[in-house]
Amino acid sequence: MSRVSTAPSGKPTAAHALLSRLRDHGVGKVFGVVGREAASILFDEVEGIDFVLTRHEFTAGVAADVLARITGRPQACWATLGPGMTNLSTGIATSVLDRSPVIALAAQSESHDIFPNDTHQCLDSVAIVAPMSKYAVELQRPHEITDLVDSAVNAAMTEPVGPSFISLPVDLLGSSEGIDTTVPNPPANTPAKPVGVVADGWQKAADQAAALLAEAKHPVLVVGAAAIRSGAVPAIRALAERLNIPVITTYIAKGVLPVGHELNYGAVTGYMDGILNFPALQTMFAPVDLVLTVGYDYAEDLRPSMWQKGIEKKTVRISPTVNPIPRVYRPDVDVVTDVLAFVEHFETATASFGAKQRHDIEPLRARIAEFLADPETYEDGMRVHQVIDSMNTVMEEAAEPGEGTIVSDIGFFRHYGVLFARADQPFGFLTSAGCSSFGYGIPAAIGAQMARPDQPTFLIAGDGGFHSNSSDLETIARLNLPIVTVVVNNDTNGLIELYQNIGHHRSHDPAVKFGGVDFVALAEANGVDATRATNREELLAALRKGAELGRPFLIEVPVNYDFQPGGFGALSI
């Protein structure tokens, strides 16, 4: 039952005003870990907004990030002062580079005792967070909290979307000065979708792009997450289908076209040539003469050098932000506007155009299919492509058409996920594309399952990243989230071992090798049912059991990697 937090005077406090305004903006959950500010805020002051206790503040930040990403609405996370805030800061960094509208909140020392680096647990929170946020401020007077929340939301929902931060001195949080709950809050006016820059004359630039398309023989659309945030996916699909233009995506934009669509040319990772032992980037881009980057974001790690294969190309940039990277990407035409507005205009501008001739990538598709069908039984552990193929199979069985989410933590296996994991809806494949935050998997799966409670969520994580944040297995169990987790275990930081071999032609075990962890026992100790699988048959059976269980389930899979360091020439070191 909700109640109004009151000061000793019996009047409502800033804590109530804070939660009330967050709720006005559509925030339904606050993920976090509470400290001594619990004397000022209980988090039951307002109905319709729930506190979700996590074991680590990083989990709180990433869970809010993913819930915000999928819903398109700002979400909130909380930390106590000092080390709580610094723990949360990696979640904040994740949301700034991964582009999610997160409202990060942290307690601060009493307003009369804020002496950073001298007062117990007192750090200059705003100075720490400001460089990696859209907006960072400290509350000075209790009655200003509503305005600060409004400013935080507006900044977070401005492209490129990202986190806003409010530091809350505990005495002001518990103060009633100027707080009047008898007066209704003004309308929140939360943006319906992120707000970007609209350049004067963008329509003329769009028409120039259409003229380039008219001359092109083999164009492609390279689509990033800003296109999804704009609500442009159906329009992009219609445009691509009408003009027969292939669609290539960044990691996080997988699912713009569903698996199996003839125009879905896949997602790009710089590791793909090495993983496949095949000239994948050359196959995807060499014949292309026009690249239209639609909602493209350099942070999503599809670098211009990757599409600059083969013949000389013209480029068109369509983005709701001014180009931040002219040194590495200088397009022939730059259209700065809302992505959906551009696609709608472009439909009219190209209405008389005939279908284009798609370039052939069948050799690449055949190579990917060969990996997914790999029937071998390996004595030293399954191969990651076999694991992902099994996950794809059971996801297709368990999910309704166009549904389901595969979450990937960070590691070498993540790039197998980019290549091989199915994604039948926007944000159907989730990973930390911008920040690559180690340990992302568990909190991202929590956020995804909460955003899509009626859809299955599968998580793939390596032993390194998973165990760096495995304490929040208990959070999954406590919330009874039916997440099916697959831990691919080689007792190694496998991606770092790859880089050792690329740079030195050998590995150095003390820097990458771990002692063994019994992840089945670890899961069970946290209240999660678990098993171990060593081959396809066992893994498929375990995945099907997990998908039908209706509660959390973990599968540990011993794996090994086969790689030739010389095949990873597309990587920048």
From Swiss-Prot:
It catalyses: D-glyceraldehyde 3-phosphate + L-arginine = N(2)-(2-carboxyethyl)-L-arginine + phosphate + H(+). Substrate binds at Y271, D301, R414, H415, L571. Keywords: Magnesium, Metal-binding, Thiamine pyrophosphate, Transferase. One of its GO terms (cellular component) is acetolactate synthase complex. Mg(2+) binds at D463, N490, T492. The keyword Amino-acid biosynthesis does not apply. Its cofactor is Mg(2+); thiamine diphosphate. Thiamine diphosphate binds at residues 410-413, 436-438, 464-465, 490-495, 561. One of its GO terms (biological process) is L-valine biosynthetic process. Pfam families: TPP_enzyme_C, TPP_enzyme_M, TPP_enzyme_N. Binds 1 Mg(2+) ion per subunit. InterPro entries: DHS-like_NAD/FAD-binding_dom, THDP-binding, Thiamin_PyroP_enz_cen_dom, Thiamin_PyroP_enz_TPP-bd_dom, TPP-bd_CS, TPP_enz, TPP_enzyme_TPP-bd. Coiled coil: none annotated. CDD domains: TPP_enzymes, TPP_PYR_POX_like. PANTHER family: ACETOLACTATE SYNTHASE, THIAMINE PYROPHOSPHATE ENZYMES. Belongs to the TPP enzyme family. Involved in the biosynthesis of the beta-lactamase inhibitor, clavulanic acid. Catalyzes the thiamine diphosphate (ThDP) dependent condensation of D-glyceraldehyde-3-phosphate (D-G3P) with L-arginine to yield the beta-amino acid, N2-(2-carboxyethyl)arginine (CEA) via a beta-elimination resulting in the formation of an enol which undergoes a second elimination to generate the alpha,beta-unsaturated acryloyl-ThDP. This is N(2)-(2-carboxyethyl)arginine synthase. It comes from Streptomyces clavuligerus.
